[in-house]
Amino acid sequence: MSTQPVYSQNKEDKPLVSFIVTYYSESIDILRDCVNSILALSLSETERQIIVVDDGADYSPINELLALSADIIYVRQPNQGLGQARNTGLALAEGSFVQFVDGDDMLLTSTYEQCLDIIRYQEADMVLFESTDKTTVKPLADAQGPVSGTEYMTHNNIHGSVCTLLFHKDILHDLRFPKGTLHEDEEFTPQLMLRAESIYTTHNKAYYYRKREGSIMHRRDRRWRIRRLADAEQVIYRLQEGVDHLPVKERIAMERRIAQLSMDLIYNVITLTHDETHLNHVLQRLSQHGLFPLPDKDYTSKYKWFRRMTNSSFGRRLLLMTLRLKR
C-alpha cells in the first residue's frame, strides 16, 4: 500500500470528507452521540465538513450542536423525507468524499479510521464497509481492490444502505435520491456504484446501526407494510426502465441487482403479509415486466433455491406456510 496520501488537502482547503447527518425525531442525546462519533475521528476541522439536515423535527437542536462544534452546518427544512434531506446535504457538501449518517446511528472510530486510510492512500472512488449493532469492534487491515463498480455488482450481491459506503463526490454528477419513497437507498446505491471506477472493500464494521422501535424499518401496522412493499416494487420497475440505456457490462450488473431486489420483494411479501392473493398480484405484475419467473442465473445458492420454490404454486404455498411472519 502507498505511504503517500492521494487525496490530501488541496490549495483551496477543500475538506476531505463531508458528513451528511439527517435528523428528524431522534433524541438530542442520540444525535449528540452521532455527531461526537464524527468529531472523534482523526480529521482536522479543515479536513471535515459536518452538515446536519433537520427534516422538520419538533425541536431544533441547533444550540446543542453549536456546543459540540462551532463549525457544524445546520439546516432546518419542512419535513420532506429522508431522500430529500440527503439531497439538501449534497447541495451543501464541499468535501472530496461524502459519508451519510442517520442521526440515530454512529460511526465507530477505530474501524472507520481504516476506511479513511483507504481514501488517504489509494485512488478510491468508493469504500464499502460493514455495519453492526455492537459498539465493540476490532479494526482490520483487510482492504481489497480496486475493482470497478460494474465488476463488483456483476459478481456480488450488494447491500442497499448508502450509509455503509464512503464515496468520491465527483462520481455523483446529477444523481440524486428519489423523493417520497421509503426505499431511496435501493434506487440510489446501484446507480452510484455503476459510476465508480475504483471500489475498495473492507470487512471493518465501521457503522453502528441503532435498532429503534417506531423507526421507518420497524413500523408494525399492515398499512405501513403494504406501502413499504409497494415502494420497493416501484423501485424495481424504475431501475428496470434504465437498463436498456446501459452498456452491455453495466446492464448485466444492473440485471443482477434487479433480480436480487425482485427476490427480496417476493420474500418480503410472503413474510410481511402471509397473503396468497397479495402475493399472486405482485407476481403477476412482475411477470408483466418480464421479472417473474426469476431469471435462471447462478447468482447464489440461496437465489437458485428460492427461484425453484417460487416457480411452482406448490412451492409458493409451502413458503407461505413455513416462512414466519416478521414481527
Residue ranges of each PLM-predicted region?
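Catalytic core of nucleotide-sugar-dependent glycosyltransferases
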Residues: 206-213, 219-249, 268, 273-292
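Cell-envelope/extracellular polymer assembly enzymes that use nucleotide-activated donors
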Residues: 15-18, 37, 49, 187
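Glycine-rich, basic loop-to-helix element that forms the pyrophosphate-binding segment
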Residues: 77-93
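Acidic donor-binding segment of Leloir-type glycosyltransferases
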Residues: 35-78
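Short, well-formed alpha-helical segments that are part of the catalytic scaffolds
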Residues: 2, 26-40
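Membrane-interface aromatic/basic loop that binds lipid-linked glycans or pyrophosphate carriers
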Residues: 1-4, 271-327
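Donor-binding/catalytic cores of nucleotide-activated saccharide
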Residues: 22, 82, 102-200, 210-226
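Short aromatic/hydrophobic "clamp" motif used to bind/position activated sugar donors
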Residues: 98
